[in-house]
Amino acid sequence: AADKQIAALDRFELEGLGHNIDFVSAIMQHPRFRSGELTTGFIAEEYPDGFSGAATSDDLLRTLAGIAGFLACAQADRARQVDGQLGDDLDPPAEWHVRIGGATHLVDVSEEDLLVDGEHLNIGLEYTPGDRLVVADIDGKELAVKLSKTRTGFKLTTRGASHTAICLPAHVAPLAAYMIEKVPPDLSRFLLCPMPGLVTAIHVGAGDKVEAGQPLAVVELLFARLGLRLG
């Protein structure tokens, strides 16, 4: 029953709202839950630092790398069919470097086989660019994976965790080492408002000492008043 529930959660799509689908899936997979050794302190005991995704095995990450490489190849094949392109009709790259879970895998895609790091991946998969869910048949077992496109690959969600896969053609991947990493700006000294509005009150002045939780300003947003506090 737990396995069927996990499979159902993998297929459930909910976007735009916060949800606990991954957390419920992780609990269903937890050995302690499956053995029935539960107490009212289960969540606090097993997730004392909060939940950031279910643990993922190396085998599953390797499988996801293969899926991501296949998806990237399908996307490239779709792109080459756009009308009005200049030059020769090129085949999509067959070799891809897929970085996922902190490791890089070499994925070789062909009509006859799918290789990950030189090893055959026994998988059956159908995908049309734009699909938000794929169901892969792996050694006779189904694995449902939710998809969302990123600038350099895909976000893959399954078995209670989301993974970002960066997919680059093998002849392009070495150049990624020369890309300058973009460091996010330090916004710790700024007061951020969730949406545009009209400032109706400011409770502090230049040079004032402020503490966490202290009200700093009031903003009017669509006829609602929002108090901004120091986080």
List the predicted regions and their residue ranges.
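Catalytic cores of soluble metabolic enzymes centered on carboxylation/carboxyl-transfer
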Residues: 2-122, 212
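Conserved beta-strand residues within beta-sheet cores
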Residues: 24, 104-106, 144, 162, ...
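Short strand-coil-strand connectors
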Residues: 99-103, 117-119, 139-141, 157-161, ...
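Conserved nucleotide-binding/hydrolysis modules and their immediate coupling elements
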Residues: 108-133, 137-144, 151-152
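Short aromatic-glycine-enriched beta-strand elements
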Residues: 133, 153-154, 214-217
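Catalytic P-loop NTP-binding/switch module of NTPases
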Residues: 142, 148-193
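Structured functional modules or segments
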Residues: 183-231
